[in-house]
């Protein structure tokens, strides 16, 4: 009888060890990728799915001028097209790039983003700014290469900023770090007033 209980106990220990190993290897739940900043703050990127959607807005567009970009972003390397409400001609936001990072800036309450994030986020805080961040890995292309996309959303003043950086999966650390650098530059740049941009 004692031998039976020893066998049951050994089996239970094996199950616990296997279970702990499975949970530690992230086979269950989401996989988080954490960027630790110089000051000790962290940004947690949660693995999610992304999908495209269409935006149904009546807008007019034009490129931001060099003077407008300098007013909003000082010396950051930005190119962007501004979106204006076609009826009242007020600016809604803009879409463009800061270096190689895609950026969409929307006035709060306006959605200019054609990307749907399917999953959970963990809110991180950097210099008092709350950031929801994540990443997505595509299926392999015909050459067997996967693309990784890191993204983040945060509010600055009266605007919501979405940034996204992509690259091949085996360079995901570089992709993540490039996006983090952009986030930090935008936070350092501070909030800006889109109402100064006229159609």
Predicted segments — roles?
Residues 1-54:
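Membrane-interface helical sensory segment of bacterial ECF anti-sigma factor regulators
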Residues 26-27, 120, 156:
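Intrinsically disordered, low-complexity segments of exported/surface proteins
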Residues 29, 33-35, 112-113, 117, ...:
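Hydrophobic alpha-helical bundles in membrane proteins
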Residues 47-148:
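Short, solvent-exposed recognition patches
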Residues 144-178:
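Short, well-structured beta-strand
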Residues 165-199:
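Surface-exposed amphipathic alpha-helical segments
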């Amino acid at each position: 009888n004692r031998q039976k209980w020893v066998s049951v106990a050994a089996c239970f220990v094996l199950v616990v060890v296997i279970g702990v190993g499975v949970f530690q290897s992230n086979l269950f739940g989401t996989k988080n990728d954490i960027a630790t900043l110089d000051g000790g703050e962290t940004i947690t990127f949660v693995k999610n799915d992304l999908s495209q959607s269409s935006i149904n807005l009546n807008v007019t567009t034009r490129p931001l001028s060099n003077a407008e970009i300098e007013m909003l972003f000082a010396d950051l390397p930005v190119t962007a097209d501004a979106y204006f409400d076609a009826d009242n001609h007020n600016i809604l936001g803009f879409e463009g790039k800061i270096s190689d990072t895609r950026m969409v800036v929307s006035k709060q309450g306006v959605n200019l983003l054609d990307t749907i994030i399917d999953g959970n986020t963990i809110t991180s805080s950097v210099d008092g700014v709350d950031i929801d961040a994540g990443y997505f890995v595509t299926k392999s292309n015909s050459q067997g290469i996967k693309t990784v996309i890191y993204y983040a959303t945060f509010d600055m003043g009266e605007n919501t900023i979405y940034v996204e950086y992509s690259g091949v999966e085996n360079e995901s650390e570089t992709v993540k770090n490039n996006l983090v650098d952009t986030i930090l530059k935008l936070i350092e740049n501070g909030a800006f007033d889109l109402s100064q941009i006229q159609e």
